[in-house]
Design a protein with these regions (language model features):
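Peripheral, non-AAA+ core regions of ATP-driven protein-machinery
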Residues: 1-218, 222-228, 331, 471-472, ...
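Short beta-strand elements
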Residues: 18-24, 283, 387-390
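Walker A/P-loop
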Residues: 219-260
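Conserved alpha-helical scaffold flanking the Walker A/P-loop in AAA+ ATPase domains
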Residues: 208, 265, 270, 280-303, ...
Length: 515
């Protein structure tokens, strides 16, 4: 008897429908074909044990299973459930009349329980695209899959539940989620607020400019000055995710297995803060399954690299291409996947090895040579890709105790959203361009061309600071954002002056002043 079940292979953010053909004839052999990896081949043992523990006997027959298309690599344990259902149907234990209506995925435990899988959301999107009536997933994955409309998604706890579902023994109801309602209810729930930050007005301003234009930013200051504290509050002033952005971000986290069992969509912009010991694969993505790395998990959000100079230099250099292209390609022997990584890079670092270079409250013990070597850990090309360099000093306790609470994030966010709306209107004719940080050179000439006085000021700064052509473009992009925050149609000298002030690390006197 020949039976077919349907599941999916996840490759990057896409899913490919896989047809499982189970043929059962007289004999005692078990054959599995179709480019299956070790985990798929081991499913035979898991299924045998699961069937025994729920009261079914594994068929004594010659079982041949083909997983098509044969040229697509089948990886992981998500094929356990469709394989088990196919074997039971071929053995006459399950009515096969509805099998063609449903896509089935899930890992089967030795006791017959269903365990969560990665990539349930891309699989659900593919199931709807291929006109399947419904999708059967483990209970832990049901909410993330149920965000796909016009698809009946059933969350099951065990293999017994799936058997009863197809045999009609019990009446199961699909999980239904009001995606839009949940999305808009959770958009503005933040754990941190800028109202908690006293002082540091210049740093808050730099973060506001960065948020308004989507600019990369680095904060340089001594220990305890509040660099990490303010970075954690940056998502609270960013524009809210659109529903399309939320869906794309959730897909990435679904593929990486980062969604909890009660999560449906990611409602807020991601904030990823990997430790400085992270590997190149952990940051960029990869491994044998081409999983997304931190740069992709931060897509549509913030990647925060605390203590930037402590990261391995080779690891940091990986960021150069993703920051420029806003996507990253991972190539393996049999396939290539591409993940989006349109993110804001926010970094922090001490100004020198001891941490107190330029600090009025402490004495720096570093020599100019030590400071120069310390700063050289960050390459020029990477630094050129960071639009805003912001110095930060610790606020003395005597002043801190007298200060009033800071401006709430909500008020800052309103200004940021207003500036972003101006940019969205400006870039409507340009596909894929949403904010000033994404502008091309041609757009700079059209939208950020400085007047004569501003151009003279910029030329003088370029000569004195020995800035690169890329740094010149960054200054114009930041100036355009400052103008948007001010509601100005033109980039004026005051905007250029502030933007030049955000190129602190380009100054040649860093290793010579203050010690």
């Amino acid at each position: 008897m020949l039976v077919k079940t349907y599941c999916a292979a996840v490759m990057g953010l896409e899913a490919i429908t896989v047809t499982i053909e189970v043929s059962m004839t007289q004999g005692v052999m078990f054959h599995l074909t179709g480019l299956a990896d070790t985990a798929v081949k081991e499913s035979h043992d898991r299924i045998r044990s699961a069937l025994a523990n729920i009261g079914y006997r594994f068929p004594v027959a010659d079982i041949t299973i083909n997983m098509a298309p044969a040229d697509v690599k089948k990886e992981g344990s998500s094929y356990d459930l469709p394989l088990a259902i196919g074997i039971l149907a071929a053995n006459g234990k399950i009515a096969d009349g509805q099998l063609s209506d449903y896509m089935i995925v899930g890992e089967v435990g030795l006791d017959g329980s269903l365990q969560p899988i990665r990539g349930a959301l891309p699989i659900a999107i593919k199931a709807r695209a291929d006109k399947f009536k419904g999708l059967i997933v483990p209970r832990q994955n049901v909410r993330e899959a149920a965000v796909v409309n016009n698809l009946q998604v059933y969350g099951m706890d065990s293999l017994v539940d799936v058997i009863n579902f197809f045999n009609g023994s019990l009446d199961y109801q699909p999980t239904i989620i009001d995606t839009r309602k949940e999305f808009f209810e959770h958009q503005y729930h933040f754990d941190y607020d800028f109202a908690d930050v006293k002082g540091q007005e210049s740093v808050k301003r730099a973060l506001e400019v960065a948020a308004a234009g989507g600019h990369n930013l680095i904060m340089i200051g001594p220990p305890g000055s509040g660099k990490s504290m303010m970075a954690k509050r940056l998502p609270s002033i960013l524009p809210p995710l659109s529903l399309a952005e939320s869906l794309e971000t959730t897909q990435i986290h679904s593929v990486a297995g980062k969604l909890g069992k009660d999560m449906s969509l990611i409602f807020q912009r991601p904030f990823r803060a990997p430790h400085h010991t992270i590997s190149q694969v952990g940051l960029a993505g990869g491994s044998n399954k081409a999983m997304p790395g931190e740069v992709s998990l931060a897509h549509n959000g913030v990647l925060f690299l605390d203590e930037l100079t402590e990261f391995n230099r080779a690891t940091l250099e990986i960021l150069r291409q993703p920051l420029e292209d806003r996507k990253i390609t991972i190539t393996r022997a049999l396939y290539t996947v591409e993940y989006p990584c349109s993110l804001m890079l926010v970094a922090s670092m001490n100004p020198c090895p001891c941490g107190y270079y330029g600090d009025p409250l402490h004495t720096c013990t570093c020599t100019p040579g030590q400071i120069s070597r310390y700063l050289s850990k960050i390459s020029g090309p990477l630094l050129d890709r960071i639009d805003i360099h912001c110095e930060i000093q610790a606020v003395p306790f005597s002043e801190l105790s007298k200060m009033q609470p800071g401006e709430p994030s909500e008020q800052i966010r309103e200004r940021v959203i207003a500036a972003r709306k101006r940019q969205e209107e400006r870039f409507k004719p340009y596909k894929g361009i949403h904010c000033n940080a994404m502008m091309t050179e041609r757009m700079l000439h059209e939208f950020a061309e400085p007047d004569t006085a501003s151009l003279d000021m910029l030329r003088m700064a370029m000569e004195r600071l020995k800035l690169s052509a890329r740094a010149y473009s960054r200054i114009l992009k930041v100036a355009r954002t400052i103008a948007d925050l001010a509601g100005s149609e033109k980039v004026e000298s005051v905007h250029i002056a502030e933007a030049i002030g955000y190129r602190n690390l380009d100054r040649g006197d860093w290793a010579e002043r203050g010690c």
